[in-house]
Amino acid sequence: MDQLAIERSTTKKVTLRLIPFLFLCFTISILDRVNIGFAALKMNHDLGFSNAIFGLGAGIFFLGYFLLEVPGSAMMVKVGPRKWISRIMVTWAILAVLVAFVKTPMEFYIARFFLGVAEASFYPCMVAYLSGFYQTKHHAKAIAGFMVAIPGANALGAPLSTFLLSVNWLSLAGWQWLFILEAIPSFILGIVCFFYLDDQIKDIKWLNKDEKKWLIDVTTKEELEKQQVKHYTFLQALKDRDVLILSAGYFCWMVGYYGINMFLPTISKGLSEKTSISTQSMGWILGLMYICAMVTMILVGNHSDKKNERRLHVAVCLAISAIAMIISSYIANTSIILSFVFLTIALCGTFGAYAPFWAIPPSFLTGAAAGGAIALINSIGNLGGFFGPYIVGYIKDTTGSFNMSMIFLGVSLIIGSCIVVFLVKQSGKVQSNNFETKLKKSS
């Protein structure tokens, strides 16, 4: 069998083995993360929470996430992906159920904080793990393959969550059942994960001898090529210029991303009330919006791989999202339909940037360094998940509308776009030139 045939068969088997399962795990994690936005439609009224209280509680999840993100990534390297990812899923499932029984703002804050602690490092561990089984040229497409779970989970979660809000079983409100029922799959998949995943390529039993040898050879060769340019240790990666700049860009992006996502059900409910659309119908509309975002994510990821370019793909997506978000704030009172259209475009932009963005760190880092860098970028970036929802809620309580909140989120996305396009050097075709320059200087 020639090398090209082996490459194709191996890549296909890896994709069929890993992508569907990781997609499912990530879908459940996103459901558990975003269901708070839908729960707010009834929970805030039942518990007497203001928008600011809800925004703080929704965002404080990311403080816990931030504190354990980098240490969690280091633990994965020490104990292995199989055990660590399994532990994450089981513990966050248990804590997600506890959120259903909060009564006061303080209980809400504490439960959300420790939920963030439990889930910390899940995403960077997934990215680092998946990247280790693919050639660099396939990273964006592979990452997009499981990252479509983000809009996919929202598309599924919107109608499912709005349905669960209408139930009242065993004297528990619908929003409580929303947390309980959506945590059960996390617990089950966490156990399955322990038996299904392989820690390293050498542990794989589902590839034949030639395929296994080819995969070990190409991934080892690419890791050595990266190390010849500059060998990064775990700690050195955390101090790298591009890693820190990517963290700053991701922070601005996540301010906009979580600011809109946590409050989108509430914003949409306000718009739908002007047209007498029911809560469940609104759930289906939101589901369609997220399906559009999912398609965009796949298309952008494929185009990024085809052009071997990351930076501009990220920047353009964020800029489009920012413009659409700002426009939607100006037309919300004049055209409900157009407002939903521009909100959809904004979602497509924020989701479309994911695959090319996360293909950048593995393109110049490897092994523990890649895991640590991804964890740092994700943890610092996700602090935006704390500030975004809280500031949106505060502005809404202060001004009485979401218009200024949307403008604030749009500005944050524009700043993130500028940081990525003007400051980040490691990107697609640019990267090889940087590597060649460093090699010449070191020789």
What is each model feature region?
Residues K141-T162, P185-S186, N378-G388:
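Glycine-rich segments within core transmembrane alpha-helices of 12-TM secondary carriers
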Residues R17-N51, G157-S161, I260-P265, G388:
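Extracytoplasmic
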Residues G48, G80, F101-E107, A118, ...:
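Helix-breaking motifs and short loop linkers at transmembrane-helix boundaries and internal kinks
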Residues V77-M89, D305-L318:
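Cytoplasmic membrane-interface "Motif A"-like loop-to-helix N-cap segments
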Residues R310-I360:
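C-terminal transmembrane helical hairpin of 12-TM major facilitator-type secondary transporters
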Residues A111-V148:
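Cytoplasmic helix-loop-helix junction between adjacent transmembrane helices
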Residues I36-G37, L235-I298, Y354, W358, ...:
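Extracytoplasmic gate region of multi-pass secondary transporters
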Residues L67-M106:
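Conserved MFS/SLC helix-loop-helix module at the cytosolic interface between two early adjacent transmembrane helices
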